[in-house]
């Protein structure tokens, strides 16, 4: 099945896998999904990610992270903000705060994909890809 928005597909797969407490989630491997996975790993929301396969069959295997004995997922909600039909951009002064700073916004900037906090520190704006909390 062809997917037009690989990032939305990735977020949906993570959301569904965390609800049923799966450890590993396969997502399509693109530069954007790898960059978002790197940000999630740096923020401590996933354990790791690995590239697997060749060509069109390349997959990114994300290892989700859970807390406590009840295995509560660290990622409780993911929301796609900018989408192919309606792009959302924010300059450095308009960068959103997610849940008053508890969550993160993932921003695609001229310096790469980063969190809203990193973008504020770097003084750059960009496309608001998604919210994670």
UniProtKB/Swiss-Prot annotation:
Keywords in alphabetical order: Ribonucleoprotein, Ribosomal protein, RNA-binding, rRNA-binding
GO cellular component assignments: cytosolic small ribosomal subunit
One Gene Ontology MF term: rRNA binding
Gene3D superfamilies (alphabetical): 3.30.1370.30, 3.30.1490.10
Swiss-Prot/TrEMBL GO biological process terms: translation
Superkingdom field: Bacteria
Oligomeric form and interacting partners: Part of the 30S ribosomal subunit. Contacts proteins S5 and S12.
Protein family (similarity comment): Belongs to the universal ribosomal protein uS8 family.
Record's function text: One of the primary rRNA binding proteins, it binds directly to 16S rRNA central domain where it helps coordinate assembly of the platform of the 30S subunit.
Name of this chain's protein: Small ribosomal subunit protein uS8
Lineage: Bacteria, Bacillati, Cyanobacteriota, Cyanophyceae, Gloeobacterales
Gene from which this protein is expressed: rpsH
């Amino acid at each position: 099945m062809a997917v037009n928005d690989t990032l939305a597909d990735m977020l949906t797969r993570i959301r569904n896998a965390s609800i049923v407490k799966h450890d590993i989630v396969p997502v399509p491997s693109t530069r954007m999904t790898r960059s978002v996975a790197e940000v999630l790993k740096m923020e401590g929301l996933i354990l790791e990610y690995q590239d697997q396969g060749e060509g069109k069959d390349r997959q990114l295997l994300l290892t989700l992270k859970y807390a406590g004995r009840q295995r509560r997922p660290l990622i409780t909600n993911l929301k796609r903000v900018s989408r192919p039909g309606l792009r959302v951009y924010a300059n450095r002064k308009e960068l959103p705060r997610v849940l008053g700073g508890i969550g993160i916004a993932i921003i695609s900037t001229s310096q790469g994909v980063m969190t809203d906090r990193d973008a504020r520190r770097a003084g750059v704006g960009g496309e608001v890809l998604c919210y994670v909390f």
